[in-house]
């Protein structure tokens, strides 16, 4: 819906607050990168602000900049001064953990908000589709953004992912234990992506639950790399085989429909939700025709929101 058909999805208050805290942590890391390069200014292309190194130590200033930027970008999300203060407390808590152990300013920062776009040139990952008068072909790509990469020396790097929410598997409602995090798809795919980008480097993966459990660190190996690729292969083949997508809940009674998804909204006075309308369109016309009619072909392979990055949604349907 969002990536192939250009419908704009919902951002909820907790998610937006998490993005704000991520932005504060990113700026602290950007300060360290600037210092390593001998610079005295941090240029933030996202917010358009240039900050001195001294300003980068002002956590309240960073929080206010991030809060104002993202609330202006998402005016439909109603958060105010109470949430502004909460975001600041989260950032303060994050950098205070174990006497500043996870404060980016105390680390050797290799990169912040590192974007990856990995094309998997394997026979199983090849695709070819006909749309209107175009042929779209290539290989499956995975795209994303890593919060922070730390240089631990001797060719060893640590991928660090921040989480402000609960330590739950939202698909099952169960707590993510260390054992479950060892098989966490997001963390495995981070490892897979970075090993593709930097094959000569070694990576560990850490996830820091600021408000629910602290730091968990995993060391992956070649077997985990292969597991990650197998996850991708199975998901790709599953998606490719679908001709008639199923709704999570036909009547939108599932909690994800109620709390997380904007597509339950009515589609153009049709008496149907957006997802119901598209379901019926696919049933009548087929997937290809629906993508041709509703989609933006030039947007299908582009990256949306990630980390502090905002998608260009000028063509998105509200």
Regions picked out by a protein language model, each given a short descriptive name:
Residues 1-8, 73-74, 165-172, 234-243:
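Short amphipathic alpha-helical segments and their helix-coil junctions
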Residues 1-3, 19-30, 191-192, 263:
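Short, hydrophobic/amphipathic alpha-helical patches that form generic packing surfaces
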Residues 116-234:
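Mg2+/Mn2+-dependent nuclease catalytic core
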Residues 24-127:
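A non-catalytic, helix-rich entry segment at domain boundaries
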Residues 5-13, 32-37, 77, 173-176:
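Short, polar/flexible loop-turn hinges at active-site or ligand-entry regions and domain interfaces
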Residues 179-184, 189-318:
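Metal-dependent nuclease catalytic regions and adjoining charged, substrate-binding loops involved
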Residues 13, 17, 21, 83, ...:
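Hydrophobic (often cysteine-bearing) scaffold residues that line and stabilize catalytic clefts
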Residues 1-15, 306, 310-318:
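C-terminal, charged and often intrinsically disordered regions of DNA end-processing helicases
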């Amino acid at each position: 819906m969002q990536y192939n058909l250009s419908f704009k999805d919902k951002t909820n208050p907790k998610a937006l607050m998490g993005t704000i805290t991520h932005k504060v942590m990113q700026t602290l890391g950007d300060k360290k990168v600037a210092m390593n390069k001998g610079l005295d200014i941090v240029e933030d292309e996202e917010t358009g602000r240039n900050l001195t190194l001294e300003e980068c130590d002002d956590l309240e200033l960073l929080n206010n900049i991030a809060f104002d930027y993202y609330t202006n970008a998402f005016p439909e999300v109603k958060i105010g001064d109470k949430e502004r203060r909460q975001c600041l407390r989260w950032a303060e808590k994050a950098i205070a953990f174990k006497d500043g152990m996870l404060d980016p300013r105390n680390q050797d920062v290799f990169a912040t908000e590192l974007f990856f776009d990995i094309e998997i040139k394997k026979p199983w990952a090849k695709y070819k589709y006909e749309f209107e008068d175009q042929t779209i072909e290539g290989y499956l790509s995975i795209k994303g953004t890593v919060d922070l990469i730390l240089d631990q020396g001797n060719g060893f790097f640590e991928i660090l992912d921040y989480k402000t929410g609960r330590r739950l598997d939202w698909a099952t409602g169960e707590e993510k234990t260390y054992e479950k995090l060892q098989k966490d798809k997001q963390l495995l795919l981070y490892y897979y992506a970075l090993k593709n980008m930097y094959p000569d480097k070694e990576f560990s993966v850490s996830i820091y639950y600021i408000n629910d459990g602290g730091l968990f660190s995993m060391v992956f190996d070649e077997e985990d790399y292969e597991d990650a690729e197998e996850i991708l292969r199975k998901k790709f083949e599953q998606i490719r085989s679908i001709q008639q997508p199923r709704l999570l809940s036909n009547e939108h009674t599932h909690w994800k429909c109620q709390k997380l998804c904007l597509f339950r909204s009515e589609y153009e006075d049709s008496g149907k939700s957006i997802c119901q309308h598209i379901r019926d369109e696919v049933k009548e016309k087929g997937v290809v025709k629906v993508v041709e009619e509703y989609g933006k072909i030039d947007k299908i392979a582009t990256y949306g929101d990630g980390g502090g990055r905002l998608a260009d949604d000028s063509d998105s349907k509200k």
